[in-house]
């Protein structure tokens, strides 16, 4: 019977087939609040009502364009209202993966890391920083000129060519729990975490 209620009357909250209240959600499943306010008024009252519709781009990209902030509500005459407020500006997306620059050259140290201040790093980004062989925080010492001057083998450079220098501390504290990073390092091949137990 709930489907027959308020057919021609005032717009009230939506209900499901059992009469339970249902919240409006946007296309991504985020709840929408803002009855009575449209456009700029809804945005000022509720913050960014409906959320910014910034579609996902690849990591490390910078998206310049229109950021649509939408507000939903009812108009004073009973007609459903929908207002948009375009905001122009820069929206930084991505979490700073290394770009692969810094290879080659004549023995220069290049520190490849994009720092986006204000961005939060995810767990995977923190893990990738700690693992050797990833490009998250790499100090390249690709010394093309150092090999022939007696610092190492021909073309070898100082240290390992193209590898990052990571100080790894392998502590075995018996009786203490291992951290998440230690457990992950043990699972990955080539990280030196396998102790042979």
Curated annotation (Swiss-Prot):
Residues 1-14 have a biased composition (Polar residues). Sequence repeats lie at residues 16-21, 26-31, 126-133, 183-190. Pfam families: Dehydrin (PF00257). Residues 74-83, 144-160 have a biased composition (Gly residues). InterPro entries: Dehydrin, Dehydrin_CS. It comes from the Eukaryota. Induction: By abscisic acid (ABA) and water stress. Residues 165-188 have a biased composition (Basic and acidic residues). Residues 16-31, 126-190 are annotated as: 2 X approximate repeats. Residues 1-86, 133-197 are annotated as: Disordered. This is Dehydrin DHN1. It comes from Pisum sativum (Garden pea). The lineage of its organism: Eukaryota, Viridiplantae, Streptophyta, Embryophyta, Tracheophyta. The gene is DHN1.
């Amino acid at each position: 019977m709930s489907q027959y209620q308020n057919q021609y009357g005032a717009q009230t909250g939506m209900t499901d087939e059992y009469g339970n209240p249902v919240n409006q959600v946007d296309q991504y499943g985020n709840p929408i609040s803002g009855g009575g306010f449209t456009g700029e008024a809804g945005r000022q009252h509720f913050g960014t009502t409906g959320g910014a519709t910034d579609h996902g781009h690849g990591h490390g990209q910078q998206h310049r364009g229109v950021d649509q902030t939408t507000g939903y509500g009812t108009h004073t005459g009973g007609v459903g209202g929908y207002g948009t407020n375009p905001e122009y500006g820069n929206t930084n997306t991505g979490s700073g993966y290394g770009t692969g620059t810094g290879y080659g050259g004549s023995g220069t140290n290049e520190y490849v890391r994009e720092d986006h201040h204000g961005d939060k790093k995810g767990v995977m980004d923190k893990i990738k920083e700690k693992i050797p062989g990833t490009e998250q925080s790499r100090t390249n010492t690709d010394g093309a000129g150092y090999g022939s001057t007696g610092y190492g083998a021909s073309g070898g450079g100082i240290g390992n060519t193209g590898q990052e220098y990571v100080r790894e501390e392998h502590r075995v504290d018996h009786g203490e729990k291992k951290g998440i990073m230690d457990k992950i390092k043990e699972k990955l091949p080539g990280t030196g975490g396998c102790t042979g137990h």
